[in-house]
Amino acid sequence: MSKVNKEGAQQTSLLDVLKKKMRQAREEAEAAKDEADEVKRQLEEERKKREDAEAEVAALNRRIVLVEEDLERTEDRLKTATSKLEQATKAADEADRARKSMETRSQQDEERANFLETQVDEAKVIAEDADRKYEEVARKLAMVEADLERAEERAEAGENKIVELEEELRVVGNNLKSLEVSEEKALQREDSYEEQIRTVSSRLKEAETRAEFAERSVQKLQKEVDRLEDELLLEKERVRNLTEEIEQTVQEIQGS
């Protein structure tokens, strides 16, 4: 082979090598570009994921703040509800104690009222009995007064008779003793009537005293019954107010 041919062959071989290297370089450049694009895409995805994550973290932080605020408000409402519940429980306990006390007191008042009513009835019976006795004594007194009046009439008649007898004494001296005996008996009857009047008057005063005492007892017992009835009404009103307050508190708790 000639020198020229050798040089041409060497140049052709070198050109092929250069083309091959250029092709390889282009391929490597394209591969590097593709790799760079992939890396860029991955970086963009990572950036987007990071932004999304940051946005999600921010949203979660805002949500946490809202949840914390809601939790704080819930805790405040819970404290308020707990306080109201404690107050309602205390009020319910007080109302229950008041109810039991009122029931006991009402029972005692009812028993006392029954006892006082019994005493009032007994006092009324005593007063009625005293009235009957007073009427009976008054009737007997009227009878005694009538007897006394008749006795006075008889005494007056006796005195008239004595006058007549005294007039006749001068004529009928033998009848003097008989007339004296008649006069003595008349005086004895008069003394007996006066004693009966004193006895009846004493019994009448006693009956009047008992009647006054019975009337005062009835008035006193009636006042006591009225007072107990007023106290019972006040206790019932207090229990009704406590019950309304408890119901209102429970409604407020349920409304919260």
Swiss-Prot record:
GO terms for biological process: actin filament organization; embryo development ending in birth or egg hatching; locomotion; muscle contraction; negative regulation of actin filament depolymerization; regulation of actin filament polymerization; spicule insertion. This is Tropomyosin isoforms c/e. GO terms for cellular component: actin filament; cytoplasm; striated muscle thin filament. It is found in: Cytoplasm. Pfam families: Tropomyosin (PF00261). One of its GO terms (molecular function) is actin filament binding. Residues 21-52, 75-116 are annotated as: Disordered. Belongs to the tropomyosin family. Keywords: Actin-binding, Coiled coil, Cytoplasm, Muscle protein. Residues 24-52, 91-114 have a biased composition (Basic and acidic residues). PROSITE patterns: TROPOMYOSIN (PS00326). Disulfide bonds: none annotated. Changing E206K: In lev-11-x12; confers levamisole resistance. The gene is lev-11. The keyword Cytoplasm applies. Residues 1-256 form a coiled coil. Isoform e is expressed in the pharyngeal muscles, germline tissue and intestinal cells. Isoform c is expressed in the pharyngeal and intestinal cells.
